[in-house]
């Protein structure tokens, strides 16, 4: 019993193995989930989803809020100028019976051509992360973290055809994928995204609503 206790106490929370075990297990709860309403099985009190994609000189933000199972999920698509941050376009939508219903479908398809969140198609788990090439691993203790939590940042070079299609690049070309999460935190809060030349090109965050 003493040996087991000592071994557990010696777990290195900053190691790749520990962080991939943690993040892989958590992310696999969500990635993939084709029907957004199924996320209520994981987060019964509700959840929010945010996504950002760089399009030329603009950033396209998609935000969805889900607070009660069985009711339409509501969201917005906004295009902002990346330099001035001024809003250029805004479209509201609902997610009902497994489908997006847009205020202006034609304009929505221009702003959000993939018409889906990453988590609806992308598969992420411990095994996938373990096989990828790790480029960076940063662990920040809560005393030094602006969120007040123990946080971690993992960056990989990995082939993800789903992401490549959204970015409009060759599917065989690796992308720089990053994962930002919290260690020993209440509730699900994860961010994933891609970078090119140290600039974020695609980003998504899922946050569990806690009561």
Question: Which residue ranges define each predicted feature?
Answer:
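N-terminal leader/targeting segments and the immediate start of mature chains
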Residues: 7-52
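Extended beta-strand-rich segments in extracellular/periplasmic secretory proteins, especially
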Residues: 125-181
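An acidic-aromatic
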Residues: 63-119
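Acidic, serine/threonine-rich low-complexity disordered tracts
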Residues: 169-211
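Flexible, processing/modification-adjacent segments and terminal tails
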Residues: 95-149
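Hydrophobic lipid-interacting interfaces of membrane-associated proteins
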Residues: 52-57, 82, 159, 193-201
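Bacterial N-terminal signal peptides
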Residues: 1-6
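Short, solvent-exposed coil/turn segments at beta-strand boundaries
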Residues: 41-47, 65-74, 94-99, 149, ...
